[in-house]
């Protein structure tokens, strides 16, 4: 986590210093192989508000930026084309596959919810109804393919009161690296800037990560569903069933009870679906102290900010910026077969 005290252009940190865990020769050989791993295409549709990223003609993921409560990635496809994430769930319909947001209060204004802006929609029966609070995609700054990688950069604005009150600006960067066999890696940096005045962050102590990922139920440790009117007195009933997924962190802990709110360099969520094991891992920034991770067996997980910026109000002064960098590894196999620990070592050594 980095705080930057300037409104000038923010540079993405790519060169890292953590020691590699792989043999030097193997690490050195990786970049050339990755550059030729797959052909990348970008397909942008402003009418639909989507930017599709394809590897060898197959969809890898889509950046959703149209009339949405907040821009997000969905779907995020596994190497064999299964949806690793889910866009909207019941319960927790505010979850958005892969998303980034938090509650914030611009000095002199009310608290705005950018964690769950869905609930601020003016007319909940009309999908095209505006949102009182919203993270809005402003424009793309970069869409390029170079040396076998894709680089995406977008300008966003966190807005309250139907767009009348700009709260913060955001610069979002995603570097896409194909790994072969349908696998790929996303190097993501999210930077928010208090461009319009002091902003007080008001995160919930428990229910937040930065960013969040919500796995599809077919990859979750537990499956939950709502049975309408099936509970006592005709109330809705939440049903939980054992799923196929497994959560594993860098320290060897397994599943939600052992990994939630525990410090780790990375957390992996994998499952065997239709006889094929695949998964998604979140990597923390190797240049920062390892964070605590929020994890849930029903499918949600992600890194948190440092303790002094978690679960308690803190102020981002006017002109200051706050950045979060993570890696997302989409892989075949489980945590071992997918070489998650080795891939993190590559990331830390600047080889991804």
Question: What is each model feature region?
Answer:
Residues 203-288:
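Active-site/ligand-binding surface loops and adjacent short beta/alpha elements
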